[in-house]
């Protein structure tokens, strides 16, 4: 009888241990899946935020040739400044990584600032041109949208990068492969470049 009781107790203990192990395994697997899915959602948010920036940058790039053509008629002596703007635009359009894109955008913003300063000082009559005023308004609006999109993107990158660094989520993040490494912020270099391009005259 005692032997039978010990066997039953041993069997019960074995079943309890097996159940606890099974519950732990299920909990770990569920946590792993939940954490992996969180990384996928965060990665998608970062990519969506970058796509939004890309749309506004493309609009900005498309606007610049129209702006240059409009100003050419008024500012014949600003050909070097116009060439710098177009060259900076082309560099920015061909940049691939976030870091390269940020550096190129810094250059383009600086060229646009120089361009607008030169035009506003030397050609005040351009203020009467309806096409120029329309392009100026569009550029100003795009600059605001870009700034807002840049803040949103950087916020998503911060959330993603933080999740990659926190324990124990970092264990899952390190095993997720390509696309799941720390992301770069889309930052402007200096306080002067952080200000929007001044497009008012």
Where are each of the predicted segments found?
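A helix-centric hydrophobic-segment signal that preferentially recognizes long
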Residues: 2-201
């Amino acid at each position: 009888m005692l032997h039978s009781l010990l066997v039953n107790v041993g069997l019960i203990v074995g079943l309890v241990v097996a159940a606890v192990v099974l519950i732990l395994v299920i909990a770990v697997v569920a946590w792993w899946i939940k954490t992996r899915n969180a990384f996928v959602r965060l990665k998608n948010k970062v990519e969506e935020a970058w796509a939004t920036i890309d749309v506004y940058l493309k609009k900005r790039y498309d606007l610049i040739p129209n702006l240059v053509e409009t100003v050419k008629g008024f500012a014949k002596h600003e050909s070097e400044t116009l060439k710098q703007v177009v060259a900076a635009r082309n560099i920015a359009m061909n940049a691939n990584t976030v870091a390269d894109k940020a550096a190129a955008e810094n250059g383009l913003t600086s060229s646009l600032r120089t361009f607008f300063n030169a035009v506003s000082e030397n050609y005040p009559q351009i203020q009467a041109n309806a096409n120029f005023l329309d392009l100026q308004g569009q550029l100003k609006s795009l600059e605001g949208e870009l700034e807002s999109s840049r803040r949103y993107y950087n916020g998503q990158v911060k959330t993603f990068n933080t999740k990659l660094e926190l324990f124990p989520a970092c264990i899952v993040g390190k095993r997720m492969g390509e696309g799941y490494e720390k992301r770069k912020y889309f930052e402007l270099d200096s306080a002067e470049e952080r200000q929007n391009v001044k497009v008012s005259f």
